[in-house]
Amino acid sequence: MISSLRGTVLSVSGQTLLLEVHGVGYGVSVTPRHALELRHGSEATVLTSLVVREDSLTLFGFPGPDELRAFELLCGVTGVGPKSALAVLEHLDPEAMAQAVAAEDDAAFRRVSGIGPKTAKLIVLQLAGKLFVTQPRTRSASSAASTVTADVVTALIGLGWSERVARTAVDDAAAAAAEQGLPADMPRLLRVALGMLGPQQPAGAPAAAQAADR
């Protein structure tokens, strides 16, 4: 089993990290929030969970033990697969997850794309008493990045796009900023996301794009 990897970041695209370890490149699935912390050419260490399927082997990577444990606990919940678990961690860090479970706040999980009311309730029920944060992370760049991406997604939804389309565009915009080493602030992400959506723009989007360019 591969429990961790340490090496050089060759690329970060969307939710895929390519990490070179002793000449071998490993493709690792990460959250967009985690991807924003990684830079091309830098050294990085990720804790990993290997998910084995009949036709595939997929590595999921995390910045710390709390994220890894939260991911594995989520994957143990009925109806939650690895991709859905990663989506939850994009919206809620382990500390926020623990607080939501303790408060029986299933609404916090319903906000995650792909998590319905029934699954959200199961998460709260099945994770009760299991989530403990051992290394609280300071709410610095990663937390700020998550807030910014959520705000941009909300803005795009308000302009008429579906949550799925909006989130995909923002994730791609955030990944592009990370690859170029540029700050992922709200004006930049909104401008780039609108540019990616292009011809799909609903009424009112062009004005928002002009506002973002100012």
Swiss-Prot record:
Residues 64-139 are annotated as: Domain II. It comes from Clavibacter sepedonicus. Disulfide bonds: none annotated. This is Holliday junction branch migration complex subunit RuvA. Keywords: Cytoplasm, DNA damage, DNA recombination, DNA repair, DNA-binding. One of its GO terms (molecular function) is ATP binding. The RuvA-RuvB-RuvC complex processes Holliday junction (HJ) DNA during genetic recombination and DNA repair, while the RuvA-RuvB complex plays an important role in the rescue of blocked DNA replication forks via replication fork reversal (RFR). RuvA specifically binds to HJ cruciform DNA, conferring on it an open structure. The RuvB hexamer acts as an ATP-dependent pump, pulling dsDNA into and through the RuvAB complex. HJ branch migration allows RuvC to scan DNA until it finds its consensus sequence, where it cleaves and resolves the cruciform DNA. Has three domains with a flexible linker between the domains II and III and assumes an 'L' shape. Domain III is highly mobile and contacts RuvB. Residues 144-214 are annotated as: Domain III. It is found in: Cytoplasm. Residues 1-63 are annotated as: Domain I. The keyword DNA repair applies. Homotetramer. Forms an RuvA(8)-RuvB(12)-Holliday junction (HJ) complex. HJ DNA is sandwiched between 2 RuvA tetramers; dsDNA enters through RuvA and exits via RuvB. An RuvB hexamer assembles on each DNA strand where it exits the tetramer. Each RuvB hexamer is contacted by two RuvA subunits (via domain III) on 2 adjacent RuvB subunits; this complex drives branch migration. In the full resolvosome a probable DNA-RuvA(4)-RuvB(12)-RuvC(2) complex forms which resolves the HJ. Residues 139-143 are annotated as: Flexible linker.
